[in-house]
């Protein structure tokens, strides 16, 4: 498991690098390889089968007006052919219940609650589950605890570490916190003015 921490000041290019890896921004030179596969020319939605992502803003990555279980179902069905079938099967419900239980936030008892009613930390935890549900080749964590209070941020970081370790996920995590970079990463990437130094 490679856990690389990307650090650098504001405007150093950290989020731009993640956006290039995710396919949001095209690159004008070089290649982007994920697990040996050249994804440089693939669009963002084509890369989605390789990448899980959690954003800095807890409001991104989930559909606020949908229920927790519906959000998880969207993530589980990502990359599959679209059908007219709607709803969540009993098997899916049971799977999501067990997944949510591992978070230890009581969300398994609130599966039909709208995601928009959750706290920032609860929402980031659900987003983390959604991003890792399909066992991506690469998990991108873009300052995913920056908008949370210190206690909640610590809990989300612990959950992140647990999920990454259990699923053997290669991860790129952007952080401004050097202590977190050292604690959770096994390699550090320092950026300055758009370059890795």
Regions found by a protein language model. Give the residues of each.
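Helix-to-loop junction immediately C-terminal to a conserved catalytic motif
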Residues: 22
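Catalytic Walker B motif of ABC-type/P-loop ATPase nucleotide-binding domains
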Residues: 139-142
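Helical segment within the ABC ATPase nucleotide-binding domain
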Residues: 154-167
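H-loop/switch region of ABC-family ATPase nucleotide-binding domains
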Residues: 175-176
């Amino acid at each position: 498991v490679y856990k690389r921490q990307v650090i650098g000041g504001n405007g150093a290019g950290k989020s731009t690098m993640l956006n290039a890896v995710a396919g949001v921004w095209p690159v004008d030179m070089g290649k982007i390889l994920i697990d040996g596969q050249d994804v440089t020319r693939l669009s963002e939605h084509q890369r989605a089968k390789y990448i899980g992502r959690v954003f800095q803003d807890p409001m991104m990555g989930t559909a606020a007006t949908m229920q927790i279980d519906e959000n998880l179902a969207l993530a589980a069905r990502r990359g599959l052919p679209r059908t007219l079938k709607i709803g969540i099967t009993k098997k899916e419900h049971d799977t999501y219940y067990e997944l949510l239980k591992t978070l230890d936030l009581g969300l398994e008892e609130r599966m039909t609650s709208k995601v928009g009613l959750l706290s920032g930390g609860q929402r980031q935890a659900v987003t983390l589950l959604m991003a890792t549900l399909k066992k991506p080749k690469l998990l991108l964590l873009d300052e995913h605890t920056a908008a949370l209070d210190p206690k909640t941020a610590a809990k989300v970081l612990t959950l992140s570490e647990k999920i990454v370790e259990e699923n053997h996920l290669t991860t790129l995590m952007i952080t401004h916190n050097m202590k977190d970079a050292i604690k959770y990463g096994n390699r550090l990437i320092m950026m300055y003015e758009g370059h890795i130094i």
